[in-house]
Design a protein with these regions (language model features):
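GNAT-family acyltransferases
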Residues: 1-145, 166
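Conserved acetyl-CoA-binding loop-helix of GNAT-fold acetyltransferases
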Residues: 148-165, 185-187
């Protein structure tokens, strides 16, 4: 076999996702991200009211989806095999979840804005991660009092940079897409 042919075989990217992932902390200008946990208090920040206008799902469905995404992210970080195959249902594919953390007093009242939720103001996800197509969807969920302040604009490009970065520094995605319901005119 010619030497060039062998080196080209070695350089072909794997289309398999790793069995375990290390979710990196990410620092933005306004907030920072850390791996999400099941204990993060999304209900404390009123993340689900008005969900149908933002994500197209009602409050109950949105809450269930967020909890499932976080569980799948934690499981992947722990090296646990997913219980769903992900073949027929994109919602059951691998997920990476970060909690959005603030340490700021943006409203000037002398207190950290999200003390009741341990500084969590929302979550950002890479969901529907498809190793074969090297693609995923990005989704941001913010607490009701934290919407419209530029947090998504701060963190989405940073998460996308991680998603596009070649392995092992990132996920090596070729495409990251977002789905926004028609009624969510702000996004």
């Amino acid at each position: 076999m010619p030497e060039n042919a062998e080196s080209s075989i070695v350089s072909v990217e794997s289309r398999e996702l790793p069995e375990r992932i290390t979710i990196p902390p990410i620092r933005g200008e306004m907030v920072h991200l850390r791996p999400a946990t099941v204990a993060d208090r999304m209900d404390a920040i009123d993340a689900y009211p008005g969900a149908s206008g933002i994500t197209g799902k009602d409050r109950v469905a949105e809450r269930a989806a967020v909890h499932a995404w976080v569980r799948r992210s934690v499981a992947w970080a722990n090296g646990e095999t997913p219980t769903e195959s992900g073949v027929g249902d994109p919602e059951s594919r691998r997920t990476v979840a970060w909690s959005i953390i603030t340490e700021s007093d943006h409203d000037g009242d002398g207190e950290i804005d999200a003390a009741a939720s341990y500084n969590v103001i929302g979550m950002i996800f890479l969901i529907d991660i498809d190793g074969w197509a090297r693609s995923s969807r990005i989704q941001v969920i913010l607490g009701q009092d934290f919407r419209g302040r530029g947090y998504s604009r701060d963190i989405m490009p940073r998460v996308m940079t991680y998603g596009f970065a070649p392995e092992p520094a990132g996920l090596g995605m070729h495409r990251i897409w977002v789905a926004v319901p028609e009624q969510n005119t702000r996004s």
